[in-house]
Amino acid sequence: MRAKAPPSHEMIRRIQQGLRFHELEVLQDNIDIPLEELAAKLAISRSTLQRRKTAGRLLPDESDKLMRFSRLLDHATDIFGDVDKARAWMKHPQRGLGGVSPLDYAETEMGAREVENLLGRIDYGVYS
């Protein structure tokens, strides 16, 4: 069972301060992709990734993107009832996203909303 998410105002404050680098590593482990690949999805270069690791903290915009992926993985886990199924779904091309994987689609906020819409349709049994 996952821990209860903190209230929105607390998450917003944490994002504005910049999340700890460790939270990037936790999401990387949960999604099960290489750290450099996740960083690229967050628009973080290799050299910047090393600087963030040394500093121990992400910038607010990077933190916001990190939370976007975390939120989608949580939503997919709720829908599929299992983190392994959610993880597999997030990595594979989906017809409802034009043959693009949810991880790739969610690199933008608009794409993330489409992934959330698709998860909602799956939850209600509308797979198109």
Locate each region found by the language model.
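Non-transmembrane "mature" sequence context
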Residues: 1-128
